[in-house]
Amino acid sequence: MPFTLGQRWISDTESELGLGTVVAMDARTVTLLFPATGENRLYARSDSPVTRVMFNPGDTITSHEGWQLQIDEVKEENGLLAYTGTRLDTEETAVTLREVLLDSKLVFSKPQDRLFAGQIDRMDRFALRYRARKFQSEQYRMPWSGLRGQRTSLIPHQLNIAHDVGRRHAPRVLLADEVGLGKTIEAGMILHQQLLSGAAERVLIIVPETLQHQWLVEMLRRFNLRFALFDDERYTEAQHDAYNPFETEQLVICSLDFARRNKQRLEHLCDAQWDLLVVDEAHHLVWSEDAPSREYMAIEQLAERVPGVLLLTATPEQLGMESHFARLRLLDPSRFHDFEQFVEEQKNYRPVADAVAMLLAGNKLSNEELNMLGDLIGEQDIEPLLQTANSDRDGAQNARQELVSMLMDRHGTSRVLFRNTRNGVKGFPKRELHTIKLPLPTQYQTAIKVSGIMGARKSAEDRARDMLYPEQIYQEFEGDSGTWWNFDPRVEWLMGHLTSHRSQKVLVICAKAATALQLEQVLREREGIRAAVFHEGMSIIERDRAAAWFSEEDSGAQVLLCSEIGSEGRNFQFASNLVMFDLPFNPDLLEQRIGRLDRIGQAHDIQIHVPYLEKTAQSVLVRWYHEGLDAFEHTCPTGRAIYDTVYHDLIAYLATPENTDGFDALIKTCREQHEALKAQLEQGRDRLLEIHSNGGEKAQALAESIEEQDDDTSLIAFAMNLFDIVGINQDDRGENLIVLTPSDHMLVPDFPGLPEDGCTITFERDVALSREDAQFVTWEHPLIRNGLDLILSGDTGSSTISLLKNKALPVGTLLVELVYVVEAQAPKHLQLNRFLPPTPVRMLLDKNGNNLAAQVEFETFNRQLSAVNRHTGSKLVNAVQQDVHAILQLGEAQAEKSARALIDAARSEADEKLSAELSRLEALRAVNPNIRDDELAAIDSNRQQVMESLDQANWRLDALRLIVVTHQ
């Protein structure tokens, strides 16, 4: 190679050294100094792995003093280059910069610069970059983006609500599905969509204290959302890091009590600029016009400051119209300001519900009914649609559906309230109760008697709680020497049941963690029964492992022993046998226990086994739950209300179970109240609201579309390719499970989303639902999203050289494959990617500028190519550099044409969709006051900003591959 002192070269193998300068040479070697790092390198003069750095007219270069020069002319004298052009900071022309004075920290970012500087990537990285661009663009445009990545079953009514609400600007809604229908999942789906699209960045979740960990686990396990749990200790710690402790985290969970208890803390919460507020168990927010509770006022303060609000409640409005109004008032105080007016409005919705029922029944409508429909819809030119709906012609069904949609858009609280009931949703199993009456051991009788004498001063409630758990009373007296499990008949029954049903998975729930741990030891030591334990003293990872062991079909645990608190938020639908070793204190906890198995999607009827000891509080409670509330075999929305009504009487019977006088009458009273309340609920069901919340065929089609996407294998192929190139080890464990671990030769030392000790992943939704230790990998999973960012935000794969062995073409024929990206810059909340995500435009040009890309598909072409090592590649580039420059100029003109077409199409689509949505809501605003002014203003503002951003869209060369034809 012809070296001269002062020339600038770059290392092919250590490009991070920057620009090198020739400082010494002899007949056989050359020494380069790399000023950016202060290092020297000694190379052989012949065949050294370095590339001469030469710039061309039109390029912009930087001097060692920091100013930039746009090159007009390049001169060579005695082997050294001098660049003449315009200095950009002073606009001085005819400025000369000698190559020895170039900035040594020079970074080549353009693909063509990297190619000419010898920074040549491996061929497989170029292919990965193009695939990443293509797949990313496709995923951004998916209409159900944000709904596929969660570890949940594809349940239509949940998807319908999430799809509707998740795309709104700052949604303010009340989610009031019945228990077991998945409100937490719906809220999580909405959050996931809003965070993924950039519509929201800061989220606050406020829940009762007992549900904090359940939400923390649910958000992480199902949605890969890492929330920070704030309590007194965390709040104090965070005060050292920021004036407002809540600004130290983007996603926060705290309890309602924590938020309400301290005035300064509430002020900090209100000032923390959240985008979304989620409040669970919102029916506990007590309100009356004269005396709202402190809890209600705290949430009211937050709701006034936070743009988006999701309230979750399982209590239907019929059990308290005033509290229902209070919750709606939090969402839109200007709309729901007068309780009396609200009650009157609700009465007026009955004709609308009747009209919907008529349309859905498919019966012919009378003229009177047609007139009523016309009046309710209030649209001009509605007559033809009404006539079609009332005929036998094609399209009658579609016309009826359109009329139903119009009615639902215009009336009721359907935009702010969503409520699904078990009656309206299919897919729930039956519940069958098996009670097992067992004798009370003499040891317990003695312990209870002594406890009664010693605890005479205890409150009735404390005595009642003690009487529910006789093993605890006995153990307190006996201490460490007590072995209640040796004589408690429930233990014998449980062992017998498990040994005679070895093939069945059984979930056992008891009130205390200590009971679960003792039972595990007994089952293991006496019968060799494989039992996993699950309690609040375990970490989330330990609970995951226990749940995973229980879920394994062949070698897994037969039984999972859970404490009351430990089982919160976990669902085990693959099991259908539930044993309640004891009974919980109130109906809500009973429903929560059964709800671990009784979920939508459960494939089998649920067998509920309740072994109880006669003459104890257990025998009282089992009768009250079953005969008084029918709470074992059916969900019991009335349970809490009746429990509160008869609380003192019930406590008295539980505290003194031997006293049964009047208990039958109490059960009869409770049953009558239960039936009356149930009838009241059924009569007051808002069919219109249920139809809207359920989503019908539209929701079913959405679920099927996502299921189809789940079956697409392109993600698996891409992910494996990505993991290989990034340097992540993959170990196939069978059963559709893969273990990923970091390797010593990764592209980055710490791959975001991959733990140091690795993780187990699956691409199968069913496997992910049964194996909580496995992460469910989709296009929306952090591993894939971070992988795409890693490849596309840097220059990985942006320049490469390949050989094409093809005897039909002359040796040395040049082809250049160009990948341009058309993109627009805009704030994330505008969700510009719906219309114009970063979109790749691929071209395959010959020397004359003919584009062969349409005839030569990428993957087919890629398989025909072979790699070139970097050193040989640099030589090839130097030989054909002028030709490549010429082809690049031809490509630029073609890229502009393609880019303009994409941008114009995106503008048309954005204008059409956003204008249509704005027009629809403006028209509805006249007849439905539930459409907020700020929502209309936001859509209008968004439309203008989106159009402005698309006007400024641009394109750039993202990757380049030089292909040389060979016959060898």
Swiss-Prot record:
- Which terms are listed as keywords in the entry? Activator, ATP-binding, DNA-binding, Helicase, Hydrolase, Nucleotide-binding, Transcription, Transcription regulation
InterPro entries cross-referenced by the UniProt entry: Helicase_ATP-bd (IPR014001), Helicase_C-like (IPR001650), Helicase_RapA (IPR023949), P-loop_NTPase (IPR027417), RapA_C (IPR022737), SNF2-like_sf (IPR038718), SNF2/RAD54-like_C (IPR049730), SNF2_N (IPR000330)
What molecular functions are annotated in GO for this chain?
A: ATP binding; DNA binding; helicase activity; hydrolase activity, acting on acid anhydrides
Residue intervals of the Helicase C-terminal domain: 490-644
One of the GO biological process terms: regulation of DNA-templated transcription
**Pfam families xref list:** Helicase_C, RapA_C, SNF2-rel_dom, Tudor_1_RapA, Tudor_RapA
Residue ranges constituting the Helicase ATP-binding domain according to the UniProt record: 164-334
Q: Mind telling me which SUPFAM superfamilies this protein's record contains?
A: P-loop containing nucleoside triphosphate hydrolases (SSF52540)
Q: Where does ATP bind?
A: 177-184
- EC number in record: 3.6.4.-
Xref: Gene3D superfamilies: 2.30.30.140, 2.30.30.930, 3.30.360.80, 6.10.140.1500, 6.10.140.2230, P-loop containing nucleotide triphosphate hydrolases, Tandem AAA-ATPase domain
> Keyword Translocase: yes or no?
no
Q: Please indicate the residue ranges that the annotation assigns to the motif DEAH box.
A: 280-283
Q: What's this chain's function?
A: Transcription regulator that activates transcription by stimulating RNA polymerase (RNAP) recycling in case of stress conditions such as supercoiled DNA or high salt concentrations. Probably acts by releasing the RNAP, when it is trapped or immobilized on tightly supercoiled DNA. Does not activate transcription on linear DNA. Probably not involved in DNA repair.
* Assembly: Interacts with the RNAP. Has a higher affinity for the core RNAP than for the holoenzyme. Its ATPase activity is stimulated by binding to RNAP.
Which family does the record claim for this protein? Belongs to the SNF2/RAD54 helicase family. RapA subfamily.
**Which protein, by its recorded name, is this?**
RNA polymerase-associated protein RapA
